[in-house]
């Protein structure tokens, strides 16, 4: 498996929409929770660490004694609300409007203190802005990694806003840990291309790319279309994700 397209440019069903086979390849389970106005959903698992990321919608997210309102009409210029919690805990989402939510999980019995990250707590990096004539300028939004989440956690999570006609995940780079990219486009008929080693895939709305085996994974959006993707990485046992390695000789582009 490399590119999975069960929901390409289609309407999600109400409830959970599972990207089958992804967990077997990466250790990460990825689902889209589609909620109608006025509905409520409690997200929990006895065995899985879980992250909940608001892609679009309006409502309230409740974790432990904290209640946090969210309203995100566009991923182009708004940061997400993200909840991250261990196995055994539960998050409740109440949808004030139709909402689309990513639910990322991994088997992990380790206990840690969960948290809700507000839009103001999302770290935004203007990566590539001043190099290569701005051709790989993008926004990288980090929800949490090893330096932010408690050490027993196994998920790293963030977003990329890939501007029209520009590259991201560039210069080419790789890492040992498995990763997934979930894509959306604005307008939704947009497309881009994703490299995976020597293979190149045409990416469309609601596709998911599985990245394994040290393969490079640079991306590019077609002119006229914003490309957005959620990226999630799973720490390996005794080998947590601490960053990527640029691929030679392309690393010289940064000198």
Protein language model annotation of sequence segments:
Residues 46-67, 164-165, 170, 176-208, ...:
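Glycine- and acidic-residue-biased ligand/ion/polar-headgroup-sensing regions
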Residues 30-34, 51, 82-84, 103, ...:
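Conserved hydrophobic/aromatic beta-strand scaffold that supports enzyme active sites
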Residues 76-96, 106, 203-224, 230-234:
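Conserved metal-binding segment of the jelly-roll/cupin
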Residues 87, 95, 103-108, 144-147, ...:
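Short, structured patches in soluble enzyme cores that scaffold and shape functional sites
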Residues 99-140, 195, 230-255:
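Double-stranded beta-helix
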Residues 2-9:
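Intrinsically disordered, low-complexity terminal regions
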Residues 9-42, 133-180:
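A short glycine-rich, His/Asp/Glu-containing loop-to-beta-strand
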Residues 31-32, 37-94:
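Extended, compositionally biased flexible segments
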